[in-house]
Regions:
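Periplasmic-side early beta-strands and strand-to-turn transitions of outer-membrane beta-barrels
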Residues: 264-417, 442-462, 497
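Outer-membrane beta-barrel channels and translocator barrels
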Residues: 198, 228, 255-257, 299, ...
């Protein structure tokens, strides 16, 4: 039988386990993925193990030195090393020293440096060999399936833009149609890794989470390829130290300074002059093919960076900036049947559809609506709809038939961005090393209205467009302490922040600016966006619009905390770790407080009841006369204050059973309670609360009969305790077993067999919870 802990009980249990782990922190390891480990063996010429040999791992570039001693079987492990290029040397009394150079360690890697064969001789004599990079890339100390994109590949592999996530398409098991040509925060949700859902991945920069907790598909910040040392993607069979998400694990490591100064300056340019026009755009105007110009497609990227020592072997810095000036096509040809200049004022004399007067059932004389014949209320609607229709672009095509488009365009939006990155590394003393890294993004995009965008959607093109301000930053702070040569502690903190605000410019979307005052169910201020109009009928490609979500904003802050220790005991690397994340997400609802009208041609056609005549009437005429098919308006736009706490911990052992066989086994525990609203605004339909005796009655057309019952029958609320705080119960602490192995089939370290098994849990995207506040309670809960 499976039982779920209540939220309250799970909280208490989690707290007790946190205290236990803190007290027993002597056997824990780094749970994040910025560090790696180097394994190896030391033997003599006869193949016998050499115990108590001294192994020294150094990185002259960043002044790192680590010394370990071999165990009874001549093996050694050096954990918690920063990614980089190392020199590994082994020495013992009575033997020549052996030194292996160019040992490249990657993030989250368990690198086998191979066997160090010591020859009898004086300690002052040494043998130096260069590591085989190809051989070292074989993963023989873990069952994980992962792929590394090294710094060299980052430089050598051409991209369609500057999006580092575009490299994921090179990895086996990753499927995506991601277009990484533009620099944008969209992308992590565009990949399926080994069949997992696209929004179930974790993406970290130097161990700090970089995923928006609303859709789990966008990132807080971007970082350009020149600022990255390497990128690693774990696709399956990863160890218990990796969690938070059920899909792939993407780990990006930023560049750091070194004992030498390095830098670069770069410029990238792209122009639509090298592109062919859209074939459909060439054919859009039958009278003059090719008259619809190509969309502007221009990239001008300028960047620079510099890194070096503040004090050699002690402190280093890395600083870089990249400026993006982008004009990005909105996505193909946009064409529709826009109202002509005459139609906007009620003159349909040039329109190939007969317009009927709904009051008389007869055609209007000359196919013209005379506004002077309307009463005051009708005239008010006529004048306001006329103003709204005048906001659409005028025709620029000659339609080939009555039902063809008379307007076509290809638009681009402006998206200037700036990336800043600063990293500081500091060797405090022999036992403590610290680094801090800050990435800052500044962005303000301006979109034309005639585009599919987050909040300015549709085919009204107003001066100034729609503007999105999106500042964001991501920080990583990390301290590694060497307690003993085999016992290390690492603590890290990673806050990440993003803000977004959408809206028009200078009131261009507002009813006040445009002088529109159509009837509303609920009063609205002059700053409210213009009403949305949905036109239908005549088999015409009518334009549409949606501005009800303006102005819109969201603010997402996550804070990660990790405290981990590594303990190496003979041929075991025992690992236990702790991960905690706090998320805040403040977001205003989408909505239609501006009012949404739907209009068709029926009222002004020859058959207003059956609406069988598509060759008469027109939606524009029906709107001018105030014949709306439906109207919908929200009374308010609530703001959600969504929060969650997430705690995960694990125990794991990497056991080098034989020189050729490694076993990974461990258990991770995840406490992932649902997001909740801090104002207790969540409402859901709960079948347990439904009373059939008080249910509303429905007529033959499916409409609710007024005053026939309780409209809120079955609705539960987190505010009054009829629902759990997050809408549904927490599943408590969930176990996630992990098992993996790696076996070298041959002694030449050229063929490795790996396998593994594991379970993971994932937090559902926040939007599923947000809708319980933003929408009418149509969602169903099964507590």
């Amino acid at each position: 039988m499976v039982s779920f802990l209540s939220l309250k009980k799970a909280t208490l249990t989690g707290a007790l386990l946190l205290i236990f782990l803190t007290c027993c922190g002597g056997i824990a390891l780094l749970a994040q993925i910025t560090s790696g480990a180097i394994f190896g063996e030391v033997r003599d010429q006869s193949g016998a193990y050499i115990s108590k040999a001294t192994v020294t791992i150094t990185s002259p570039a960043i002044g790192v030195t680590r010394t370990v001693v071999t165990g009874d079987r001549g093996d050694f492990i050096a954990p918690n090393l920063l990614p980089g290029t190392y020199t590994v040397s082994a020495e013992a009394s009575g033997f020549r020293k052996v030194e292996k150079t160019n040992v490249i360690l990657s993030a989250a890697d368990r690198l086998d440096a191979g066997v160090f064969v010591l020859q009898v001789g004086a300690a002052t004599q040494s043998v130096t060999v260069t590591a085989d990079a190809g051989e070292l890339q074989l993963q023989s100390n873990s069952g994980e399936r992962s792929d590394l994109i090294s710094g060299k590949q980052l430089n050598d592999v051409a991209l369609n833009g500057r999006m580092v996530l575009d490299y994921m398409r090179l990895i086996p098991g990753v499927v995506s149609d991601f277009d990484g040509s533009a620099s944008t925060t969209y992308g992590i949700g565009a990949f399926n890794v080994n069949g997992t859902r696209a929004n179930t991945h974790e993406y970290t920069i130097d161990g700090s989470s970089n995923v928006d907790t609303g859709d789990n598909a966008t990132t807080h910040v971007t970082i350009n390829p020149d600022a990255i040392a390497e990128m690693k993607v774990l696709t399956s069979n990863y160890q218990a130290e990796f969690g938070k998400a059920g899909g792939g694990q993407v780990a990006v490591v930023s560049k750091s300074g070194s004992n030498e100064f390095h830098g670069n300056v770069r410029f990238f340019h792209r122009n639509e002059g090298m592109n062919a026009n859209n074939w459909f755009a060439d054919q859009a105007n039958a009278a003059t093919p090719g008259s619809v110009p190509i969309a502007l497609y221009r990239y001008n990227y300028i960047g620079y960076q510099v890194g070096g020592p503040i004090k050699k072997n002690k402190a280093y810095f890395f600083w870089g900036q990249e400026y993006y000036r982008q004009l990005i096509p909105t996505g193909g040809l946009d064409q529709f049947r826009t109202p002509t200049a005459l139609e906007r004022v009620g003159d349909f004399s040039q329109t190939p559809f007969t317009i009927y007067n709904p009051a008389t059932g007869l055609p209007f004389p000359g196919n013209k609506i005379d506004p002077s014949t309307l009463n005051a209320a009708q005239r008010n609607v006529f004048d306001n709809v006329s103003k709204l229709l005048s906001l659409y672009s005028l025709p620029n095509l000659t339609p080939a038939s009555a039902t063809d488009s008379n307007f076509a365009t290809q638009l681009s939006y402006s998206d200037p961005r700036r990336e800043d990155i600063l990293r500081l590394d500091y060797q405090i003393n022999e036992r403590n090393r610290f680094f801090g890294r800050w990435v800052n993004n500044a962005e303000q995009s301006t979109s034309p209205m005639q585009t599919w965008n987050l909040n300015c959607m549709g085919q009204l093109q107003l001066p100034g467009g729609c503007v999105n301000n999106a500042p964001s930053w991501n920080l990583a702070l990390d301290l590694v302490t060497t307690i003993t040569p085999t016992l290390l502690n690492e603590v890290s903190v990673g806050p990440s922040v993003t803000r977004s605000s959408w809206g028009g410019t200078n009131g261009n979307l507002s009813i006040g600016k445009n002088g529109i005052s159509l009837p509303m169910l609920y009063p609205v201020p002059p700053s409210t966006s213009i009403p949305d109009m949905g036109f239908n009928g005549n088999n015409l490609p009518y334009p549409w619009s949606y501005f009800g979500a303006n102005p819109w904003f969201q603010a997402n802050t996550t804070i990660d905390f990790n405290d981990n220790v590594t303990w190496v005991k003979n041929n075991h690397a025992l690992k236990f770790g702790l991960f905690y994340q706090r998320s805040r997400k403040d977001q205003i609802a989408w909505g239609n407080s501006n009012g949404q009208y739907t209009i068709d041609n029926c009222a002004t056609s020859s058959d207003p009841v059956g609406c069988t005549d598509n060759n008469s009437g027109m939606a524009y005429a029906s709107a001018l006369l105030g014949y709306f098919r439906s109207f919908d308006q929200s009374s308010s736009r609530p703001i959600g204050y969504f929060r969650y706490n997430q705690l995960e911990f694990y125990g794991q052992d990497t056991w080098k059973i034989t020189p050729r066989l490694t076993l990974d086994y461990g258990m991770r525990f995840a406490w992932i309670p649902p997001q909740y609203d801090a104002k207790n605004q969540i409402a859901l339909f709960n079948p347990a609360l439904y009373d059939a005796a008080t249910a509303v009655k429905i007529d033959a057309d499916g409409n609710i009969i007024p005053n026939s019952g309780n409209l809120l029958d079955g609705i539960g609320y987190s505010k009054n305790g009829t629902l759990p705080k997050g809408g549904w119960k927490s599943r408590g602490i969930m176990p996630e077993p992990r098992l993996g192995f790696a076996y070298e089939l041959t002694q030449d370290h050229k063929t490795v067999l790996r396998g593994g098994f594991g379970t993971s849990h994932d937090r559902e995207q926040g939007n599923l919870v947000f809708n319980t506040v933003f929408q009418n309670p149509i969602n169903v809960v099964t507590p």
